[in-house]
Amino acid sequence: MKNNTPHAPLILASASPRRLDLLARIGIIPTHTLPADIDESETPKELPRDVALRLAQEKAQKIYENNKDKNAFILAADTVVACGRRTLPKGETQEDACYCLKLISGRSHRIYGGLCIITPNGTVIKKCIETRVKFKHLSKQEIDQYVASGEWKGKAGAYGIQGRAEAFVKSIHGSHSNIVGLSLYDTMNILNGLDFFKPV
């Protein structure tokens, strides 16, 4: 059986251990991880899906412009969690976590995964992947226990589906890995279309 190996280096424009782990599942080990220092503020009336796509592209573009390895592909992603048209914050404080969990308790919400890949010749490919998630109704005790766990820290929407919060999920429509931080299906499809892999 033939394996696929990347024919060119790939720079992940992120320091996220979750995205590194996801890429490793499909046999991709980035040659470098370079978090992009960009302004992640929303613009007025910007829709959540547009935020995810814009931030992913800005991250990729920032690394591409400063990258000295002209044979490298750049991959960037951004995750935005939204309930209705309301964008949920990343979990920075316990107040953030309580706010998010109370808002999505018993409700459906959407995860928008912005994905941007820039090829060595500067071609930009971008896509926004949407996953719908429905949580069960959360009791005060469940919210308090989850907040005390600290799992929500730094995560979009203040929860991580790969941890204790998976027990809150009634249903998922779409890519599970998109919720974690990167749609593997879409990433692989785009890279295959760019001849990123070659058989060995």
What are these regions, as identified by a protein language model?
Residues 1-73, 86-87, 148-149, 192-200:
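N-terminal polybasic phosphate/anion-binding patch
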Residues 23, 56, 78, 97, ...:
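Residue-level signal for inorganic ion chemistry
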Residues 51, 79-109, 135-137:
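Active-site-adjacent loop/tail segments of enzyme domains
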Residues 73-79:
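Ordered, amphipathic secondary-structure segments that act as subunit-interaction surfaces
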Residues 79-82, 111-118, 159:
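Short beta-strand scaffold segments in enzyme catalytic cores
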Residues 82, 116-120, 136, 170-171:
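Short beta-strand-to-turn element immediately C-terminal to the catalytic PLP-Schiff-base lysine
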Residues 98-103, 113-115, 122-126, 130-131:
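Anionic-ligand binding region
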Residues 126-200:
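Active-site oxyanion/phosphate-handling segment shared across diverse enzymes
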